[in-house]
Amino acid sequence: FATKFILEYAEQFPKLRFNMLSPSDVPSFLEGKADVICLSAQAQLSNCIMLPRGRMIFVPVATPQYLKEHGPINHPDDLLHHRVFSNLYPNSFSLNSNYQLTKKGQSCSFQAIDTIRYSNVEMTRRSVLEHAGIAPCMPLFFIIDDLEAGRLVPVLGGWHRPSHQNYVVCKDDDWKIRQIRMFSNWWAQKLGDYEKECEARLIKLYGRKFFLNLIH
């Protein structure tokens, strides 16, 4: 979806050049090496404009084939018996990931010592689609097509990583530059609209009750 959106903007402003990096590198952004950055659940950054771009909703998933071969996964304790593919990265070289999971007012912490951990969410998705394990916290917007096609299904019986706000961020000084301000506003609106579309599609698939549980 990001490619489609960027191409749309590039067609309107053909002289602009885009260099897209993933995952986001906050230190490099603060050093002035990037004009705009997408962040999730970050504390307020000083001297920055933070534009809301929708909610980050996480869905724990596996493939139907994996569940058929390994049995149901209904509780965080079940994760101990499965390969967990993580795209959390407390630092670049740590294999330890601490999952904060919640369900209907309850919460628990799961400490995963990942044998395979990715800093790129697409690699996590591919590993799960290859029936190699489960992903406890996949972003909804990244897997909504897979959910609709039945390639992935929710697991953990309603337990999930808490949702949080997403932002498009630029520095105060850059906000004064019309080109950067225009793109930042447009990008935040596009991403926010897409998040809402994904939420509506999820409700159509699993119902409003399922959705409401994920956003708390």
Model segments located where?
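Flexible hinge/capping segments at coil-to-helix
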Residues: C48-R55, A62-N87
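Beta->alpha turn/N-cap motifs
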Residues: S24, S40-Q42, A62-P64, C137-F141
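Hydrophobic hinge/microswitch elements
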Residues: S107-P154, W159-R161, K176
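Central regulatory/effector-binding core of bacterial HTH transcription factors
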Residues: F1-S46
